[in-house]
UniProtKB/Swiss-Prot annotation:
Function: Has an important function as a repair enzyme for proteins that have been inactivated by oxidation. Catalyzes the reversible oxidation-reduction of methionine sulfoxide in proteins to methionine.
Family: Belongs to the MsrA Met sulfoxide reductase family.
Gene Ontology BP terms: cellular response to oxidative stress; protein modification process
Keyword field: Oxidoreductase
GO cellular component terms listed in the entry, alphabetical order: cytoplasm
EC number(s) recorded for this UniProt protein: 1.8.4.11
Record: active site: C16
Species this protein is from: Geobacter metallireducens (strain ATCC 53774 / DSM 7210 / GS-15)
Single GO term (MF): peptide-methionine (S)-S-oxide reductase activity
Name of the protein in its database record: Peptide methionine sulfoxide reductase MsrA
Origin organism lineage: Bacteria, Pseudomonadati, Thermodesulfobacteriota, Desulfuromonadia, Geobacterales
Length: 162
């Protein structure tokens, strides 16, 4: 009998990927995280290219999780709490489409859950402005450079620029 859990992926963009990755790494049931790029047209983009805002990519975190231990709905709940989804193409001082709020879905079930979650958040009364989060089908995930992986953890914690 195979005891290996069936793992799933979720991909989120919520500003600087250092902060996003650190938040999801704390979640019980998340077995791995990877900082990277998604949503653009350039293959194998570098950090410098993504920051130039000419690749179309967002900084994202790929979350590998065990759905028997943490649900996709719980990951969505966390996503909404770790950034301001009403800021268009920015988070705090980080400005540009590469810092956009985005949920990349991997399955039709994830798409449905993401849309329902966004509708619920939008009607929650938590925000004075409309939610501008993009929901899109996952495309190729490009790993960020090694120095970006678990960046804050390697430096003893901290936060991004804000």
């Amino acid at each position: 009998m195979d005891e290996t859990p069936e793992l799933e992926k979720a991909t989120f963009g919520a500003g600087c990927f250092w902060h996003v990755e650190a938040e999801f790494r704390r979640v019980s049931g998340v077995v791995a995280t990877h900082a990277g790029y998604m949503g653009g047209w350039k293959d194998h983009p570098t950090y410098e290219e993504v920051c130039s805002k000419e690749t179309g990519h967002a900084e994202v975190v790929e979350v590998v999780y065990d759905p028997a231990r943490v649900s996709y709905d719980e990951l969505l709940r966390i996503f909404w709490t770790i950034h301001d989804p009403t800021q268009l193409n920015r988070q705090g001082p980080d400005i540009g489409t590469n810092y956009r709020s985005v949920i990349f879905f991997h399955t039709p079930e994830q798409e449905q859950a993401a849309r329902l979650s966004m509708e619920k958040e939008g009607g929650s009364g938590r925000y004075s402005r409309p939610i501008v989060t993009e929901i899109a089908s996952a495309s190729a995930f490009w790993w960020a450079e090694e120095y970006h992986q678990q960046y804050l953890e390697k430096r003893g914690g901290g936060s991004c620029n804000w």
